[in-house]
């Protein structure tokens, strides 16, 4: 058991270990993790395994973090522990075992952190935001286009700990892929950190492509001519605002991660294998491209929103012109009938034989002339 120096871990030692009811979690072999686990193991642990020479060490039963670390100290290798939304008391057990810094522990438990990289004496603390695109057939009136989660990583010389928050960003498939690549896994905890960074950024790329399709669709609708080649009436601005809100959330995940990826790819670090560090450059390059896309999305949506509002304004002006044109046409018969509705005694045309049809013909002729003139000028 590792004991951190005072006063760094004083607040951690005061936390009481509280165990939540066991939550089933399947291992790769299909067995339920929680059925045979030591009752003292925190229930937030999704998986706990020791890896030696790129292979998972199988001792015939699930390991507790303490047992896993004891195996590593005795026989070598490293331990990888995955947790999902642990409480302070649950994570205190892990923090004491691995000597994690209290500030990093606090961030890992509380969540809602910006993507970042923090270096401590014996570990690196990295925060990633995961992004998941919600398909349109799954959207509701109050749902979001993208959903976010968090993955926090503690990288040490002989341990790697992941703390996941939110329903997205499961690392089970990634762990299985790494177990199928012993050569890479043999590189140790830094190889796992790179794989998670690459996995998260690949998710950004996929979401960026999907959001691009949504923006293209909205842009097409905004600039599609209206009926009979008329002015487009635009689209519901709420949809554009929804996309802008989701792009902003996307930007909050991507932009702060640029600096950590740059540090991991360029600055030598004691806990990062130099050979693995080269691969962080590829991740940083992909992240930079996604960041450029997200910035472009924001600017494009601003332009689309302005164009949509302009289209709506033009359409309203067109409606007002039509209303005005018809009002001008209707004014003629209104005026004529108004004149002959007055009760004057001397109105000579009232006694003319063809006075009535003449007035009707005059009214219709004037209305037709006005209609033709307005139509020629584009008011109708």
Give the predicted meaning of each segment.
Residues 2-296, 349, 379-380:
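Peripheral, non-transmembrane regulatory/ligand-interaction domains of membrane transport proteins
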Residues 3-19, 285-380:
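Hydrophobic alpha-helical transmembrane segments and their immediately adjacent juxtamembrane loops
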């Amino acid at each position: 058991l590792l004991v951190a120096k005072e006063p760094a871990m004083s607040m951690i030692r005061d936390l009481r270990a509280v165990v939540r009811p066991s939550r089933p979690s399947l291992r790769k072999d299909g067995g339920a993790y929680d059925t045979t686990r030591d009752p003292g193991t925190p229930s937030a642990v999704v998986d706990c395994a020791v890896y030696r020479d790129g292979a998972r060490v199988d001792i015939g039963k699930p390991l507790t973090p303490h047992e896993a670390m004891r195996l590593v100290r005795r026989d070598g290798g490293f331990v990888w522990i995955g947790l999902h939304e642990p409480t302070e008391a649950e994570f205190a057990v892990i923090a004491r075992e691995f000597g994690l810094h209290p500030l990093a522990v606090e961030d890992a438990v509380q969540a809602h952190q910006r993507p970042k990289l923090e270096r401590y004496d014996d570990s690196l603390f990295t925060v990633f935001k995961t992004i998941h695109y919600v398909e349109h057939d799954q959207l509701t009136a109050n749902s979001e286009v993208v959903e976010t989660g968090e993955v926090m990583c503690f990288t040490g010389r002989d341990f790697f700990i992941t703390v996941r928050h939110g329903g997205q960003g499961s690392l089970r498939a990634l762990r299985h892929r790494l177990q199928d690549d012993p050569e890479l896994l043999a590189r140790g905890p830094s190889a796992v950190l790179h794989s998670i960074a690459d996995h998260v950024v690949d998710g950004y790329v996929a979401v960026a492509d999907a959001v691009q399709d949504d923006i293209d669709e909205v842009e097409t609708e905004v600039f599609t001519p209206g009926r009979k080649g008329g002015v487009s009436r635009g689209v519901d601005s709420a949809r554009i605002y929804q996309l802008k809100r989701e792009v902003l959330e996307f930007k909050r995940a991507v932009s702060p991660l640029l600096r950590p990826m740059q540090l991991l790819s360029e600055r030598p670090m004691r806990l990062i294998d130099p050979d693995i560090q080269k691969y962080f450059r590829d991740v940083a390059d992909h992240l930079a491209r996604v960041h450029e896309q997200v910035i472009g999305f924001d600017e494009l949506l601003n332009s689309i929103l302005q164009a949509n509002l302009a289209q709506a304004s033009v359409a309203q002006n067109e409606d007002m012109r039509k209303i005005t044109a018809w009002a001008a046409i209707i004014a003629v018969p209104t005026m004529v009938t108004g004149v002959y509705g007055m009760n004057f005694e001397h109105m000579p045309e009232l006694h003319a034989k063809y006075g009535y049809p003449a007035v009707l013909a005059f009214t219709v002729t004037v209305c037709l002339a006005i209609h033709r003139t307005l139509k020629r000028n584009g008011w109708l």
